[in-house]
């Protein structure tokens, strides 16, 4: 529901944009030679859903649907939602991020009570992932956080994305076991953790 830099992408009222971080300062950081990852939370976005409720997952009565933690979700089939996320992904690539990491790139794990779920959620997400890749400059990696395998399987995600990030509460061993042949878990599966493991790829989350 918030953007941590002064984006040029048009955002609806209610989505907080930190204008105190000018985009030129971000460009300076991105040109420093460091390996940078742009983190974009996609469909679990209460601020956007409340601001533009017609783009969200809803109940049978047309009111916003909320998950067990009280968060609203955007509809992955809504054109305005797809255009918004695509614009953010494209901007991150053009700014110079080496990698764009998609989070909550899924339907809710439990969609009980949702009136407007897609007939084939996996196809909806796979098609969108391919469109996002085409929006990025050549050489920019596109990765995903494995939050749920109900919409896309690990094997499908491995085919669509350069790296799979597994949160601390996730099952890292199960993700690695489900990888297709040829997908190197040492370089393409990243553990999200509070402290560094003894081996493998990881990212520190504080």
For each feature predicted by the language model, list its residue ranges.
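Substrate-binding cleft of carbohydrate-active enzyme catalytic domains
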Residues: 25-43, 89
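Aromatic-lined carbohydrate-binding/catalytic grooves of carbohydrate-active enzymes
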Residues: 1-20
């Amino acid at each position: 529901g918030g953007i941590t830099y002064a984006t040029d992408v048009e955002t609806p009222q209610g989505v907080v944009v930190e204008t105190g971080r000018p985009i030129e300062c971000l460009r300076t950081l991105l040109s420093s030679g460091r390996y940078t990852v742009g983190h974009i939370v996609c469909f679990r976005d209460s601020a956007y859903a409340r601001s533009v409720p017609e783009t969200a997952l809803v109940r049978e009565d047309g009111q916003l649907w909320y998950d067990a933690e009280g968060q609203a979700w955007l509809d992955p089939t809504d054109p305005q939602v797809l255009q918004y996320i695509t614009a953010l992904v494209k901007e991150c690539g053009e700014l110079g991020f080496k990698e764009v990491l998609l989070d909550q790139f899924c339907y809710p794990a439990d969609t009980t009570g949702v009136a407007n779920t897609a007939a084939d959620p996996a196809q909806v997400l796979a098609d969108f992932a391919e469109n996002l890749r085409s929006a990025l400059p050549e050489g920019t990696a596109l990765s995903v956080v494995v939050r749920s395998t109900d919409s896309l399987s690990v094997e499908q995600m491995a085919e669509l994305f350069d790296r799979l990030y597994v949160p601390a509460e996730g099952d890292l061993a199960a993700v690695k076991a489900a990888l297709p042949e040829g997908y190197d878990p040492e370089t393409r599966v990243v553990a999200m953790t509070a402290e560094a493991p003894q081996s493998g790829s990881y990212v520190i989350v504080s």
